[in-house]
Amino acid sequence: MLKRLTRLRLTPEALLIAGVAFANVVLHLVLPEYGYHRDEMYYVAIADGFSFSNLDMPPVAPLYLKLFLMLLGHSVRVVHLAASACGALVIVFGCLIAKEFGGKRYAIVLTGVFLVFSGLVIFGSLYSYDDPSFVVWSGALYVIVRLLKGSDQRLWVVAGILLGIGMLTKLTVLFLGLAVFLSLWLISERTWYRRPWIWLGAGIAFIGALPYVLWQRAHGWYFLSYATTYAGRTTHESPVLDFLWNQVLPNNIALLPVWLAGLALLLFNREWSRFRFFGYCYLVLCGTIFCLGGQFYFMMPIYAVLVAAGAVWIEQWFAMRSNPERPRLVPRICVPVAYVLMSLPALPFFVPVLPVDLLVRYVKPLGVNAGVKTEDRQIAELPQHMADRFGWEEMARSVAEVYRQSQSTSHDTVGIVAGNWGEASALHVYRGAFDMPEPISGDGWFYFDALQRQAFRESYVAIGVSRSVLQSVFRHVDRKGVFTHPHCMPDENNNAIYYCTGLKLNLGKYWAVSKRMDSAFENVLRREGVDRAVEFYHERRQQDPDAVLFTERQLNALGYDYLKQSRTGESIALFRLNVEAYPESFNVYDSLGEALMADRQYARALENYTRSVELNPENKNGRKKLEELKVILAMHPG
């Protein structure tokens, strides 16, 4: 049975499937290009520097892209070839599912055409780990179709291998695993749970995740903290109506009748009762992803099944109304042609088609995102997935200009630091064109890469990092430029570029605690209290003057936690320790001043806010507090 599944047969159906899949690749290669998307540059950077010792991200997506980059070189076209190839494989599995549902050549072609212009279209021109993940989902769903049709139960081993690869691609495959597990209980095939093969497949799937899980365990489960922070920082949680709308518009509103018909067949039609599992699976996925705050596109591959069912139904409808001797070809041709024509107006919302100035005018009547949001980041004139393709080369050029100026005036080797992984990825991609060193960043994969390389320098050109953070690390922070672009994401626009010199601490040791404060210091603080933690800090500094136990932001956040709990004295002690550790950061004086005000120590609060404004004359909050304190002290001079 396994041999039968994998054996290549050059039948007319196979040629049709290959033709539609190839057309999908060609479509994305002939489309115009706006430039690299933020996510794509991140995968390029990880692929270029890939190491199994840095599994901040599951390895399949960067390794898959690395294969294309090694064979064909670095370019946007190559990245989109990798993406569209994944889309082509999803289409292949969708067409095979239509065939297993009883579809003949017309249904197979319809399924392919429907999927080319479905919600998958955006992923053909935007590479991310969703692309290979969708292939895994689609392959697993095809295997389950075969199982439901009575194939050998040993196919669960194949499903397990696919899901194991999925675990090393993107952990959202767990949604599919849960949906499969629950949906099987709702059909007669629940008896499969009495047999060993399904459990063997599940075991193989979880074994596949072991390398990633073990790496995360060794690094303090960094992914969990990062995912939580990222979700709270950017991910948009949709109300139920928005979530349902997101299943319609991004998936092509013209496709709605097709997949709804497919869903109805799978759920309610007696002739389709053998495949009822997929109707339940869709409902479980919808409910689970919505309740857990997942993105609407996580379940995109399940639509290949619904579309295949809808296409087979259309074929059967025509068959019942046609004369075998005089088949009605014109109506059959009109269906895919009408679908493509109805799909074209929505295409500019999802893939690069129009010149950018025309695109801005085109999307304006319906709203920039047409009611579809995946992130809570501010947007301007373009949807987020379009705006994130603009400005990166110009940003790298601006940083390179400051870098060249700094090299001509500095005796030190100058490095480049970026505030987030998007900026760092762009600087990596364009470093060769502008003759820059490899950037570092405390965000995502770049954090661990910098820890491993330990190639820290004395001076840095920085972009995307706040002045207060830079001042806590460097004695001199000079603003040298500002990056602007008319079409980039607003949170990347008007981004200051600094030249930082006079390193005040050991950057390698600072980097090691930049994600999580020193564990020994944290344990003392939690178990023995603030006073003992302050003593511990001084003891460590006496033993090692270069020791760094926390960042200014970490201790600041902790101090505010104590302040919110009305533990004012302890918060003051923590803020004072922060002032001692980072005396040239204006922010630490602001925080200490606020705690002293809460403790009615107004004169000392005035001293700290005064120092804060001296360090940063643009500190509006500090100036406001100074005015308040002057009034308070005038009324209560004692």
Name each model feature, range by range:
Residues 49, 111, 143, 155-170, ...:
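Membrane-interface alpha helices of multi-pass inner-membrane proteins
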Residues 81-102, 116, 139, 143:
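Transmembrane-helix motifs of polytopic, lipid-linked glycan transferases
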Residues 99-105, 140-156, 190, 263-271:
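Membrane-interface transmembrane helices that cradle and orient dolichyl/undecaprenyl
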Residues 165, 174-275, 289:
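Transmembrane-lumen/periplasm boundary regions of multi-pass, lipid-linked membrane glycan transferases
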